[in-house]
Protein backbone atom coordinates (compact mmCIF):
# COMPACT_ATOMS: atom_id res chain seq x y z
CA UNK A 1 0.00 0.00 0.00
CA UNK A 2 3.01 2.31 0.28
CA UNK A 3 1.90 3.46 3.74
CA UNK A 4 4.38 5.47 5.77
CA UNK A 5 1.93 7.21 8.07
CA UNK A 6 2.00 7.38 11.84
CA UNK A 7 0.40 4.56 13.76
CA UNK A 8 -3.16 5.82 14.46
CA UNK A 9 -3.58 3.35 17.29
CA UNK A 10 -0.62 4.48 19.38
CA UNK A 11 -1.51 4.32 23.05
CA UNK A 12 -3.94 1.40 22.70
CA UNK A 13 -3.72 -1.64 24.95
CA UNK A 14 -1.34 -4.35 23.64
CA UNK A 15 -2.61 -6.16 20.58
CA UNK A 16 -4.80 -9.17 21.32
CA UNK A 17 -4.30 -11.95 18.79
CA UNK A 18 -7.52 -12.72 16.95
CA UNK A 19 -9.12 -16.12 17.10
CA UNK A 20 -12.23 -17.46 15.45
CA UNK A 21 -15.26 -17.13 17.67
CA UNK A 22 -18.66 -18.78 17.35
CA UNK A 23 -21.51 -16.77 15.96
CA UNK A 24 -23.46 -14.88 18.59
CA UNK A 25 -26.63 -14.55 16.53
CA UNK A 26 -27.91 -17.45 14.50
CA UNK A 27 -30.98 -18.81 12.82
CA UNK A 28 -31.06 -21.79 10.48
CA UNK A 29 -28.03 -22.04 8.23
CA UNK A 30 -26.81 -18.46 8.60
CA UNK A 31 -25.03 -17.08 11.68
CA UNK A 32 -26.74 -13.76 11.03
CA UNK A 33 -30.33 -13.21 12.07
CA UNK A 34 -31.95 -10.78 9.64
CA UNK A 35 -35.14 -9.39 11.13
CA UNK A 36 -37.70 -6.96 9.81
CA UNK A 37 -39.45 -6.74 13.16
CA UNK A 38 -36.24 -5.92 15.05
CA UNK A 39 -37.36 -7.73 18.18
CA UNK A 40 -34.04 -7.80 20.00
CA UNK A 41 -32.92 -9.44 23.21
CA UNK A 42 -31.70 -7.17 25.96
CA UNK A 43 -27.96 -6.57 25.88
CA UNK A 44 -26.31 -7.59 29.14
CA UNK A 45 -22.64 -7.09 30.07
CA UNK A 46 -20.72 -10.30 30.63
CA UNK A 47 -18.61 -10.77 33.74
CA UNK A 48 -15.04 -9.52 33.60
CA UNK A 49 -12.46 -8.03 35.90
CA UNK A 50 -12.79 -4.27 36.09
CA UNK A 51 -10.04 -2.53 34.09
CA UNK A 52 -8.49 0.77 35.24
CA UNK A 53 -11.27 2.81 33.60
CA UNK A 54 -14.01 0.71 35.25
CA UNK A 55 -15.58 0.16 31.86
CA UNK A 56 -17.54 -2.88 32.96
CA UNK A 57 -19.66 -0.72 35.23
CA UNK A 58 -22.27 1.51 33.59
CA UNK A 59 -22.60 5.10 34.81
CA UNK A 60 -23.49 5.42 38.48
CA UNK A 61 -26.94 7.01 38.77
CA UNK A 62 -25.85 8.46 42.08
CA UNK A 63 -23.53 10.95 40.45
CA UNK A 64 -22.02 11.97 37.12
CA UNK A 65 -18.74 10.42 36.03
CA UNK A 66 -15.97 12.95 36.52
CA UNK A 67 -14.86 12.40 32.92
CA UNK A 68 -18.26 13.15 31.39
CA UNK A 69 -19.24 16.67 30.41
CA UNK A 70 -22.92 17.16 31.29
CA UNK A 71 -25.19 20.08 31.96
CA UNK A 72 -28.43 20.04 33.89
CA UNK A 73 -31.80 21.38 32.82
CA UNK A 74 -31.12 21.96 29.12
CA UNK A 75 -31.67 20.00 25.92
CA UNK A 76 -34.48 17.90 27.34
CA UNK A 77 -35.33 16.53 23.89
CA UNK A 78 -32.01 14.67 23.74
CA UNK A 79 -31.42 11.41 25.62
CA UNK A 80 -29.59 11.86 28.94
CA UNK A 81 -26.38 10.19 29.93
CA UNK A 82 -26.45 7.17 32.21
CA UNK A 83 -26.65 9.37 35.29
CA UNK A 84 -29.70 11.33 34.15
CA UNK A 85 -27.66 14.41 33.26
CA UNK A 86 -27.89 16.19 29.91
CA UNK A 87 -24.85 15.79 27.69
CA UNK A 88 -23.13 19.03 26.69
CA UNK A 89 -22.27 18.31 23.06
CA UNK A 90 -19.75 21.14 22.66
CA UNK A 91 -17.84 20.36 25.85
CA UNK A 92 -17.93 16.63 25.18
CA UNK A 93 -16.68 17.09 21.60
CA UNK A 94 -13.80 19.19 22.87
CA UNK A 95 -12.96 16.43 25.33
CA UNK A 96 -13.23 13.75 22.64
CA UNK A 97 -10.88 15.62 20.29
CA UNK A 98 -8.00 14.69 22.60
CA UNK A 99 -8.86 10.97 22.67
CA UNK A 100 -7.94 8.24 20.20
CA UNK A 101 -10.61 6.00 18.71
CA UNK A 102 -10.59 3.22 21.37
CA UNK A 103 -10.68 5.84 24.14
CA UNK A 104 -13.69 7.46 22.47
CA UNK A 105 -15.54 4.15 22.69
CA UNK A 106 -14.51 3.88 26.35
CA UNK A 107 -15.87 7.39 26.97
CA UNK A 108 -19.14 6.56 25.24
CA UNK A 109 -19.76 3.50 27.41
CA UNK A 110 -18.88 5.39 30.60
CA UNK A 111 -21.33 8.07 29.49
CA UNK A 112 -24.24 6.08 28.04
CA UNK A 113 -23.83 2.56 29.44
CA UNK A 114 -26.12 0.02 27.77
CA UNK A 115 -27.53 2.84 25.60
CA UNK A 116 -24.45 2.60 23.35
CA UNK A 117 -24.54 0.78 19.99
CA UNK A 118 -22.40 0.64 16.88
CA UNK A 119 -23.57 0.72 13.26
CA UNK A 120 -21.83 -1.00 10.37
CA UNK A 121 -22.34 -1.34 6.63
CA UNK A 122 -19.70 -4.07 6.15
CA UNK A 123 -18.06 -1.69 3.71
CA UNK A 124 -14.43 -1.08 2.78
CA UNK A 125 -13.36 0.28 6.19
CA UNK A 126 -15.88 -1.49 8.43
CA UNK A 127 -13.40 -4.04 9.81
CA UNK A 128 -11.68 -1.30 11.83
CA UNK A 129 -14.52 -0.42 14.21
CA UNK A 130 -15.72 -4.03 14.35
CA UNK A 131 -12.26 -5.09 15.52
CA UNK A 132 -12.21 -2.23 18.05
CA UNK A 133 -15.58 -3.21 19.49
CA UNK A 134 -14.34 -6.80 19.84
CA UNK A 135 -11.24 -5.58 21.68
CA UNK A 136 -13.45 -3.32 23.82
CA UNK A 137 -15.43 -6.41 24.84
CA UNK A 138 -12.25 -8.29 25.67
CA UNK A 139 -10.86 -5.60 27.95
CA UNK A 140 -14.17 -4.50 29.53
CA UNK A 141 -16.45 -7.53 29.49
CA UNK A 142 -19.15 -5.49 27.72
CA UNK A 143 -20.72 -6.55 24.43
CA UNK A 144 -21.84 -3.49 22.47
CA UNK A 145 -24.58 -4.39 19.94
CA UNK A 146 -23.63 -3.91 16.29
CA UNK A 147 -26.55 -2.86 14.06
CA UNK A 148 -26.44 -3.67 10.35
CA UNK A 149 -29.13 -2.37 7.99
CA UNK A 150 -29.47 -5.01 5.28
CA UNK A 151 -31.21 -3.16 2.44
CA UNK A 152 -31.67 -6.33 0.40
CA UNK A 153 -29.64 -4.73 -2.40
CA UNK A 154 -26.09 -5.22 -1.18
CA UNK A 155 -23.52 -6.86 -3.47
CA UNK A 156 -23.02 -10.61 -2.96
CA UNK A 157 -19.45 -9.83 -1.88
CA UNK A 158 -20.75 -7.72 1.02
CA UNK A 159 -22.97 -10.52 2.33
CA UNK A 160 -20.04 -12.95 2.22
CA UNK A 161 -17.75 -10.38 3.87
CA UNK A 162 -20.29 -9.90 6.67
CA UNK A 163 -20.27 -13.65 7.32
CA UNK A 164 -16.46 -13.70 7.30
CA UNK A 165 -16.06 -10.86 9.81
CA UNK A 166 -18.83 -12.20 12.05
CA UNK A 167 -17.19 -15.62 12.24
CA UNK A 168 -13.74 -14.09 12.81
CA UNK A 169 -14.57 -11.44 15.41
CA UNK A 170 -17.75 -12.79 17.02
CA UNK A 171 -19.39 -9.42 17.72
CA UNK A 172 -23.04 -9.08 18.81
CA UNK A 173 -24.65 -8.52 15.41
CA UNK A 174 -28.23 -7.26 15.02
CA UNK A 175 -29.21 -7.31 11.33
CA UNK A 176 -32.38 -5.37 10.44
CA UNK A 177 -34.38 -4.86 7.27
CA UNK A 178 -37.19 -2.62 6.04
CA UNK A 179 -40.72 -3.75 6.84
CA UNK A 180 -41.54 -3.35 3.13
CA UNK A 181 -39.97 -6.06 1.00
CA UNK A 182 -37.84 -5.12 -1.98
CA UNK A 183 -40.38 -6.66 -4.36
CA UNK A 184 -43.26 -4.70 -2.85
CA UNK A 185 -41.28 -1.45 -2.92
CA UNK A 186 -40.48 -1.90 -6.60
CA UNK A 187 -44.11 -2.77 -7.39
CA UNK A 188 -45.42 0.34 -5.63
CA UNK A 189 -42.66 2.86 -6.35
CA UNK A 190 -40.62 1.40 -9.20
CA UNK A 191 -36.85 0.97 -9.22
CA UNK A 192 -36.26 4.24 -7.44
CA UNK A 193 -32.53 4.36 -8.14
CA UNK A 194 -33.13 4.37 -11.91
CA UNK A 195 -35.21 7.56 -12.15
CA UNK A 196 -32.22 9.87 -11.86
CA UNK A 197 -33.95 12.18 -9.37
CA UNK A 198 -32.83 13.11 -5.88
CA UNK A 199 -36.40 12.79 -4.63
CA UNK A 200 -36.57 9.11 -5.56
CA UNK A 201 -33.13 8.41 -4.11
CA UNK A 202 -34.17 10.04 -0.85
CA UNK A 203 -37.37 7.98 -0.74
CA UNK A 204 -35.33 4.84 -1.36
CA UNK A 205 -32.88 5.72 1.41
CA UNK A 206 -35.67 6.52 3.85
CA UNK A 207 -37.51 3.24 3.17
CA UNK A 208 -34.50 0.91 3.00
CA UNK A 209 -32.07 2.54 5.47
CA UNK A 210 -33.23 5.34 7.75
CA UNK A 211 -36.54 3.88 8.94
CA UNK A 212 -35.14 0.39 9.71
CA UNK A 213 -32.19 1.90 11.58
CA UNK A 214 -34.34 4.26 13.64
CA UNK A 215 -36.65 1.36 14.50
CA UNK A 216 -33.66 -0.66 15.69
CA UNK A 217 -32.51 2.26 17.82
CA UNK A 218 -35.92 2.46 19.48
CA UNK A 219 -36.17 -1.27 20.09
CA UNK A 220 -32.68 -1.45 21.59
CA UNK A 221 -33.06 1.69 23.70
CA UNK A 222 -30.06 3.32 22.01
CA UNK A 223 -29.05 6.76 23.24
CA UNK A 224 -25.74 7.02 21.36
CA UNK A 225 -24.41 5.18 18.34
CA UNK A 226 -20.86 5.02 17.03
CA UNK A 227 -20.16 4.91 13.30
CA UNK A 228 -17.17 4.90 10.96
CA UNK A 229 -17.65 8.42 9.57
CA UNK A 230 -14.32 10.06 8.66
CA UNK A 231 -13.80 13.75 8.03
CA UNK A 232 -11.70 13.18 4.91
CA UNK A 233 -14.56 11.42 3.10
CA UNK A 234 -16.51 14.58 2.13
CA UNK A 235 -16.35 18.33 2.72
CA UNK A 236 -19.45 18.11 4.88
CA UNK A 237 -18.01 15.37 7.05
CA UNK A 238 -14.83 17.38 7.50
CA UNK A 239 -16.90 19.95 9.41
CA UNK A 240 -18.56 17.39 11.70
CA UNK A 241 -17.74 17.28 15.43
CA UNK A 242 -16.88 14.00 17.20
CA UNK A 243 -20.26 14.06 18.98
CA UNK A 244 -23.44 15.49 17.48
CA UNK A 245 -27.20 15.35 17.95
CA UNK A 246 -28.75 13.40 15.04
CA UNK A 247 -32.51 12.73 14.86
CA UNK A 248 -32.93 12.81 18.63
CA UNK A 249 -29.90 10.64 19.48
CA UNK A 250 -26.18 11.18 19.96
CA UNK A 251 -23.89 10.26 17.06
CA UNK A 252 -20.29 9.41 18.01
CA UNK A 253 -17.52 9.38 15.38
CA UNK A 254 -14.47 7.55 16.76
CA UNK A 255 -12.62 7.62 13.40
CA UNK A 256 -13.49 11.21 12.47
CA UNK A 257 -9.86 12.39 12.25
CA UNK A 258 -8.52 9.25 10.55
CA UNK A 259 -7.14 9.33 7.02
CA UNK A 260 -7.68 6.62 4.42
CA UNK A 261 -4.10 5.48 5.03
CA UNK A 262 -4.80 5.25 8.76
CA UNK A 263 -7.65 2.84 7.99
CA UNK A 264 -5.54 0.56 5.82
CA UNK A 265 -2.61 0.73 8.25
CA UNK A 266 -4.91 -0.56 11.00
CA UNK A 267 -6.34 -3.32 8.81
CA UNK A 268 -2.84 -4.44 7.83
CA UNK A 269 -1.45 -4.17 11.37
CA UNK A 270 -4.19 -6.38 12.82
CA UNK A 271 -4.33 -8.86 9.96
CA UNK A 272 -7.96 -8.11 9.12
CA UNK A 273 -9.51 -9.22 5.83
CA UNK A 274 -10.28 -6.63 3.17
CA UNK A 275 -13.66 -6.30 1.51
CA UNK A 276 -13.47 -8.36 -1.71
CA UNK A 277 -14.44 -5.35 -3.86
CA UNK A 278 -11.45 -3.33 -2.64
CA UNK A 279 -9.22 -5.32 -5.00
CA UNK A 280 -11.59 -4.43 -7.84
CA UNK A 281 -11.02 -0.70 -7.38
CA UNK A 282 -13.85 0.22 -5.01
CA UNK A 283 -12.97 2.74 -2.30
CA UNK A 284 -16.53 2.77 -0.94
CA UNK A 285 -19.33 0.20 -1.20
CA UNK A 286 -23.05 0.49 -0.53
CA UNK A 287 -25.92 -1.02 -2.52
CA UNK A 288 -24.96 -2.71 -5.78
CA UNK A 289 -26.91 -0.23 -7.90
CA UNK A 290 -25.41 2.92 -6.36
CA UNK A 291 -21.76 1.89 -5.99
CA UNK A 292 -19.00 1.95 -8.59
CA UNK A 293 -15.23 1.50 -8.66
CA UNK A 294 -12.94 4.50 -8.87
CA UNK A 295 -12.42 5.31 -12.54
CA UNK A 296 -9.60 7.82 -12.47
CA UNK A 297 -11.93 10.83 -12.62
CA UNK A 298 -14.10 10.10 -9.58
CA UNK A 299 -13.22 8.36 -6.33
CA UNK A 300 -14.49 7.85 -2.82
CA UNK A 301 -18.06 8.90 -2.14
CA UNK A 302 -18.19 10.77 -5.46
CA UNK A 303 -18.71 7.33 -7.03
CA UNK A 304 -21.93 6.75 -5.09
CA UNK A 305 -25.54 7.28 -6.26
CA UNK A 306 -24.57 7.89 -9.87
CA UNK A 307 -22.85 11.13 -8.88
CA UNK A 308 -26.16 12.74 -7.84
CA UNK A 309 -25.27 12.77 -4.15
CA UNK A 310 -22.66 11.47 -1.74
CA UNK A 311 -24.85 10.43 1.16
CA UNK A 312 -27.55 7.87 1.83
CA UNK A 313 -29.57 9.07 4.80
CA UNK A 314 -28.10 8.20 8.18
CA UNK A 315 -25.85 10.80 9.81
CA UNK A 316 -27.36 14.26 9.35
CA UNK A 317 -29.42 16.02 12.03
CA UNK A 318 -32.56 16.17 9.85
CA UNK A 319 -34.91 13.42 8.66
CA UNK A 320 -32.52 12.47 5.89
CA UNK A 321 -28.99 11.88 7.01
CA UNK A 322 -25.50 11.33 5.73
CA UNK A 323 -24.36 7.91 4.61
CA UNK A 324 -23.44 4.85 6.55
Residue ranges of model-derived segments:
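Low-complexity, intrinsically disordered Ser/Thr/Pro- and acidic-rich segments
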Residues: 1-3, 74
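Intrinsic low-complexity, disordered N-terminal segments enriched in polar/charged/small residues
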Residues: 5-7, 15-16, 30
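Nucleotide-activated chemistry modules centered on ATP-dependent adenylation/adenylyltransferase
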Residues: 22-25, 29, 34-61, 65-324
